A protein has these predicted regions:
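Cell-envelope and extracellular/periplasmic
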Residues: 1-222
């Protein structure tokens, strides 16, 4: 069975995260399997057959995010270098930003993404035989990153509150950690950042839960 935590990026009086029980578990079948995490599915499949115990997967993930999105401010500030690189620099950059300014930047970014998607659709229609690697070389990458701000899902500690905290009270046997690409620009800090994630999650889950660290099978199309 599979449960996917709603990917709510920001919560205020107008945007509320639905209670976790409203979402419900999905049974793995031909209709739902495409929604499953591939890594999680194969792990659950082999465990189910090897130890004959039903497996439930809870997906707490969002693509393009740093490890700093998944821990709270207290842990982000435990390490001075991580605090400087991931926390201080981000919030200093937006400290004078108004909500109207942020909303304007978000609208501009969405328009750039829309135009990019139109280019991709035209390219695929014109060159149906070409793969995604060639498309990226010819058309370019998706506009990234998005604008910084209080509503940015990549903000430090953001998804910790809007996603992880919604499920941390539920007991689990292990965490499959499949993240890190977004932190390559600060790779020298990643070991320390990951250690903080592990400590923070274990504290919130009230258990010395094991973390299974998954590597990317490949990082570059070339």
């Amino acid at each position: 069975r599979y449960y996917e935590v709603p990917q709510i990026e920001y919560e205020d009086e107008n945007i509320k995260i639905p209670p976790i029980r409203n979402q419900g578990w999905q049974i793995c079948d031909n209709q739902t399997i495409n929604d499953f995490s591939a890594i999680g599915y194969y792990l659950a499949y082999y465990l189910r057959h090897d130890i004959d115990i039903p497996i439930g997967l809870i997906a707490v993930n969002k693509g393009g995010t740093s490890g700093s999105c998944w821990i709270n401010e207290t842990y982000l500030q435990k390490n001075q270098e991580i605090k400087k690189v991931y926390y201080d620099e981000y919030y200093q950059a937006i400290m004078n930003q108004t909500e109207a300014q942020e909303d304007l930047e978000i609208a501009k970014y969405k328009e750039r993404v829309k135009q990019y998607q139109q280019k991709v659709a035209l390219y695929q229609q014109t060159y149906p035989e070409r793969n995604m690697s060639q498309l990226k070389k010819d058309v370019g990458h998706t506009p990234w990153p998005g604008p910084r701000g209080k509503k940015d899902f990549c903000r430090p500690a953001g998804l910790y509150y809007t996603m992880f905290k919604k499920i941390c009270q539920y007991s689990g046997k292990a965490v499959i950690w499949y993240q890190g690409e977004e932190d390559t620009k600060n790779a020298y800090l990643y070991h320390q950042l990951l250690q903080l994630v592990i400590e923070n999650w274990r504290e919130d889950m009230k258990a010395q839960i094991p973390f299974i660290i998954v590597q990317l099978p490949e990082y570059d199309d070339d």
